[in-house]
Amino acid sequence: MGKNNDWLNFEHLVKDKQIEALKPPSMYKVILNNDDYTPMEFVIDVLQKFFSYDIERATQLMLNVHYQGKAICGVFTAEVAETKVAHVNQYARENEHPLLCTLEKA
């Protein structure tokens, strides 16, 4: 007579008795790029509004954008980075500024 408890054996559900480890998500840098037309005050506003920087840090990053051509605003998962880029670019266009926010793999 067979075992009545065979249905309790879950080993067949685990491939080779190994549990796959979860990989950390891919991360992306959100970057503000310099242009010759967007006012510095607007860049500071963007950094405070979308990245929650205080005035000192926002000013420092704005100066990096101005003098170095770009600055990393933060590193995020793909979905968060894409959303931030879209929101910043939309906000810039709504305010008629050519400010460009991009992302690249970290």
Swiss-Prot record:
- InterPro entries assigned to the protein according to its UniProt record, in alphabetical order: ClpS (IPR022935), ClpS_core (IPR003769), Ribosomal_bL12_C/ClpS-like (IPR014719)
What SUPFAM superfamilies does UniProt report for this protein, alphabetically? ClpS-like
Gene Ontology biological process terms in this record: protein catabolic process; proteolysis
PANTHER family on file: ATP-DEPENDENT CLP PROTEASE ADAPTER PROTEIN CLPS (PTHR33473:SF19), ATP-DEPENDENT CLP PROTEASE ADAPTER PROTEIN CLPS1, CHLOROPLASTIC (PTHR33473)
Q: Which family does it belong to?
A: Belongs to the ClpS family.
Chain's role: Involved in the modulation of the specificity of the ClpAP-mediated ATP-dependent protein degradation.
**Quaternary state and interactors:** Binds to the N-terminal domain of the chaperone ClpA.
Q: What's the name of the protein?
A: ATP-dependent Clp protease adapter protein ClpS
Q: What is the lineage of its organism?
A: Bacteria, Pseudomonadati, Pseudomonadota, Gammaproteobacteria, Enterobacterales
Coding gene? Answer: clpS
